[in-house]
UniProtKB/Swiss-Prot annotation:
Organism of provenance: Exiguobacterium sp. (strain ATCC BAA-1283 / AT1b)
SUPFAM superfamilies: alpha/beta knot (SSF75217)
Reaction catalysis annotation: guanosine(37) in tRNA + S-adenosyl-L-methionine = N(1)-methylguanosine(37) in tRNA + S-adenosyl-L-homocysteine + H(+)
CDD domains cross-referenced by the UniProt entry: TrmD-like
Protein name (Swiss-Prot/TrEMBL): tRNA (guanine-N(1)-)-methyltransferase
Family of the protein in this entry: Belongs to the RNA methyltransferase TrmD family.
Subunit description: Homodimer.
One Pfam family recorded for the sequence: tRNA_m1G_MT
One GO process term, biological-process aspect: tRNA N1-guanine methylation
GO cellular component, one term: cytosol
Enzyme Commission code(s) on record: 2.1.1.228
Binding-site positions, S-adenosyl-L-methionine: 109, 129-134
Compartments (UniProt record): Cytoplasm
Lineage: Bacteria, Bacillati, Bacillota, Bacilli, Bacillales
Length: 238
């Protein structure tokens, strides 16, 4: 996969040189470049922003530098993701779809956002990572890159490492425990020490259902529930 990022702050992306994403870059599983679109400004002062027509607070990113930076990529039908608080909420399903793409381009917003023509002519996806406003799209882009790259085949050591993640099944993930079995009187649930895989799977399913019910009940509307699941959830409501 190839990922290009158009940003005013390419130096922020050094964080992606570490951990799983950094290893994927080193192994050639993903190729990344970070273009400062200020370098493409034809303004003598290299300005990339201007006042909005019709008035209003703040400054907008102008089309010229971003269009020219984008076309310098000579990309063939990439998926172009524009970061904006008005976009669709990013989720695990998006990451799963994007992980199958050959080429992703991220446009990092700043100031009061982009001139609408950038939205209309360049973006294939307008995406937000939550109901809050950041100073720029760089952190949001790093979040989305991390969530996507880890799903590329062979990036994680084991496929199951992400197949059981929260949201991959539609439910929040169950609790995890490791050694020691008793830490200062805090013990691991007996079922996990039983060696009975059927009981362990049933326990994990119930834990996922309960955690989702108590923390993100909205997710249950989109999960295919068995009769056993429904009975367990009803017991929580009672």
């Amino acid at each position: 996969m190839k990922i290009d990022v158009l940003t005013l702050f390419p130096e922020m992306f050094h964080a992606l040189d570490h951990s799983i994403v950094g290893r994927a870059k080193t192994l050639g599983q993903v190729e990344m470049s970070f273009l400062n679109f200020r370098d493409f400004s034809t303004n003598k002062h290299h300005k990339v922003d201007d006042y909005p027509y019709g008035g209003g607070a703040g400054m907008l990113l102008t089309p010229q530098p971003i269009f020219d930076a984008f076309h310098s990529l000579e990309a063939k039908s990439p998926r172009v993701i524009l970061t904006t608080p008005t976009g669709k909420p990013f989720n695990q399903r998006m990451a799963e779809v994007w992980a199958k793409e050959e080429h992703l381009v991220f446009l990092c917003g700043h100031y009061e956002g982009f001139d609408q023509r950038i939205h209309d002519e360049l973006a294939t996806d307008e995406v937000s990572i939550g109901d809050f406003v950041l100073t720029g799209g760089e952190l949001a882009t790093m979040v989305m890159i991390d969530a996507t790259v880890r799903l590329i085949p062979d990036v994680l050591n084991a496929q199951a490492s992400h197949e059981d993640d929260s949201f991959s099944t539609g439910l929040l993930e169950y609790p995890h425990y490791t050694r020691p079995a008793d830490f200062r009187g805090l013990t691991v649930p007996d079922v996990l020490l039983s060696g009975n895989h059927a009981r362990i799977e049933a326990w994990r399913r119930e834990q996922s259902l309960e955690r989702t019910y108590r923390r993100r009940p909205d997710l249950l509307e989109h999960v295919e529930l068995t009769d056993v699941d429904k009975k367990f959830l009803q017991s929580l409501r009672d």
